[in-house]
Amino acid sequence: MVEASLRVSGSTNPISGRIVANGAKNSALPIMAACLLLNGSVVLAGMPDLRDVTVMSELITSLGGRISFLRNTKEKANHKVEINCDNLHNWAIPHEITSQMRASCLTLGPILTRMGRAEVALPGGCSIGSRPLDMHIWALQKLGAKVEVCGNYVKCSSSGKLVGCHIDFQSVSVGATENALMAAVMAHGTTTISNAAIEPEVADLAHFLVKAGAQISGIGTRTLQICGVQQLSGPSHTIIRDRMEAGTYALAAISTGGSVHIAGVTSEILGCLAHELEGMGGKVTDVPDGLVVSRHSPQINPVVLHTAPYPGFPSDMQAQFAATACLARGTSQIHEHVFDRRFSYARELAKMGADIHVQGNTASIRGVDKLHGASVQAPDLRASAALLIAGLSAQGVTTISNAQTLYRGYEAMEEKLRACGAEVELVR
């Protein structure tokens, strides 16, 4: 990935305008991985054009799949992709690909099911603490796979079809639920997954698999039941919209006292984010083609957030809320219960004048009157979005290095913000 920086000129201009919500990255990637299971061509609409999507495309191509991308150049969002995996000839994914994206681990189950073996280098992506694959491996072993970790590779094999079983996760894991689900849809017999993740993106994957011919019940609940089928065929499917992207643009508006019309999403899609946005002083209004988020109160209100699996507050949004809380009238607290070491952005916000302190899994943020521009470095995807929000509301110029991480989750973000009045420039 080419290194890039963002130059943000903070100003009194509020972020105001219309943005079309993109398809959800956290739905697109597992659905692309699931295409490895299918016969025939699959047409996916609502696809975001992101770095992680590009890497997943390269991964599928390296296995023998074919991918064509039809871009929506007008909106720079919600593109179409056609994927055909009829002629897979490889089961090993090298470190050069997996090191770029954690979601590469989601191909373990599909490759194993399709090819009888899989060899995937340990994944990369954002460095936000320990996110081991133990639960993924355990679930595949329960289904009858032989799994071993050799150096930096996970090697899986099966002597025949996987066999349905009861998988009872000790803790909720989105990725492990998705891997187990994809491995089970063509296993012999019935599989029950207890304590399954219920994120909308997991449900979207399940609905896609049902369209392809899978037999899955309990979608959207903590218990999934899967009756294995002989084969799956490629359907057409539209990716759900990205609640994390929408929430990020909403916070940019609240931080700057603006108003954004986000087309394609609803307050229902935002879930608990809508409630927290209003708690900070925002107003969330559903309109016929989406929703409008504006700053309702003259000041930003402090928040107390506890991250948790869905339907709780998403860990992927805590950094952006922290950036907005830097200007709140009062003290905010953010408690991170999903990942460890996810407050690496705190020292960067402090360079901009934020009064933020981290102890263990809690960040305390005492609001200040103003932030000032500074040179900062984005440690990961969501932190880069947080620093951008802070830069938009700061006085002076903020330069965000390592900003290429932003494009793992946000498509053409600087262009969309410029259309809403921001002064943002991408420098490569």
From Swiss-Prot:
Its EC number is 2.5.1.7. Gene3D superfamilies: Enolpyruvate transferase domain. InterPro entries: Enolpyruvate_Tfrase_dom (IPR001986), Enolpyruvate_Tfrase_sf (IPR036968), MurA_subfamily (IPR050068), RNA3'P_cycl/enolpyr_Trfase_a/b (IPR013792), UDP_GlcNAc_COvinyl_MurA (IPR005750). One of its GO terms (molecular function) is UDP-N-acetylglucosamine 1-carboxyvinyltransferase activity. GO terms for cellular component: cytoplasm. The active site is at C126 (proton donor). The modification 2-(S-cysteinyl)pyruvic acid O-phosphothioketal is found at C126. It is found in: Cytoplasm. It catalyses: phosphoenolpyruvate + UDP-N-acetyl-alpha-D-glucosamine = UDP-N-acetyl-3-O-(1-carboxyvinyl)-alpha-D-glucosamine + phosphate. Keywords: Cell cycle, Cell division, Cell shape, Cell wall biogenesis/degradation, Cytoplasm, Peptidoglycan synthesis, Pyruvate, Transferase. GO terms for biological process: cell division; cell wall organization; peptidoglycan biosynthetic process; regulation of cell shape; UDP-N-acetylgalactosamine biosynthetic process. Its main location: cytoplasm. Cell wall formation. Adds enolpyruvyl to UDP-N-acetylglucosamine. This is UDP-N-acetylglucosamine 1-carboxyvinyltransferase.
